[in-house]
């Protein structure tokens, strides 16, 4: 039919976002012909770059098979969330780089839930440590700075979220090891760093 799918997207982007947009995303199966058509149409019509950055995500598989109704392995995000909550799903999506295929299994989503519980426990323990601080050590502050640098390096590497998570869990290990001996100011720095890094990934939003 007319108008076609490709021109519809170019028209909507120009109307609502302008001639040049910052970021365009979609599945890898849309690179050709859809996104190439969008670029050709928009740049010819507008005389400028259509999108500054492109993100093409990998596909989601279920137990190493493509999800489809015909294979009887189809379910919705809401169905998973009803059982596990939304945050484990978010964490699960962060366990692989966005360009990589992602394989869903019950075991993996349960592992993600357990990993989140470790993060919540660490953060709650930090609050307790701050309230009852009696140490004088400041070594944890240096570990916080190292975690920030590793996290930033990971995110600058094409949003390498697996390495970003690894940086957070390295900080968790340091907090668990050093918090009892740390002074209050250092513990507060650790809490701030922890909140900043997990916040970038949209994690721990259920903390009160």
Describe the function of each predicted region:
Residues 66, 74-208:
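Structural preference for alpha-helix termini/caps and helix-kink/transition segments
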Residues 1-127:
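Alpha-helical recognition segments enriched in aromatics with Gly/Pro capping
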